[in-house]
From Swiss-Prot:
It holds the Pfam family Med31. Component of the Mediator complex. GO terms for cellular component: mediator complex. Its main location: nucleus. Gene3D superfamilies: Mediator of RNA polymerase II, submodule Med31 (Soh1). The gene is SOH1. This is Mediator of RNA polymerase II transcription subunit 31. It comes from Coccidioides immitis (strain RS) (Valley fever fungus).
Amino acid sequence: MAQEAGLIPPPPHLSNPRFTLELEFVLSLANPYYISHLAVTYPHLLGISSQSTDNDDPSASSDAKAFAAYLAYLYDYWKRPEYVQFLTHPGATLRALRLLQEESFRKAVIRPQVIEALLGTTTEVDLHVESEEDREKNNEEQAEKGSNGATS
């Protein structure tokens, strides 16, 4: 179990089974559809409550905390140069790991709009939980730009 605690990352060698297993997992996280699959299939791991389960279930909460700690561990070492060289899509992989550090993102990722944003631009993903107030402000700014452009 001490080995599973993950305090020391595995040596970065493709002959190391733990290294290759974790490499395959983090590479999968670069795919927004895989993150969506995790959110839908294993919502308790991301701390997403479902109506069919008891919200006070201590095992679901401990699973979510353990998975969040595991994601933090992965992000901590996969961003190091000796490990990042093995990532086929380092930008997308590290972005996904970084976003998964945020509890609000882990809970919001079950929404299709968040997955669509992940597939789109980076700025949309970084603003994954846009408030209604922000949305209204952006709509007003766009309307002003449109009316200013029409009168010029």
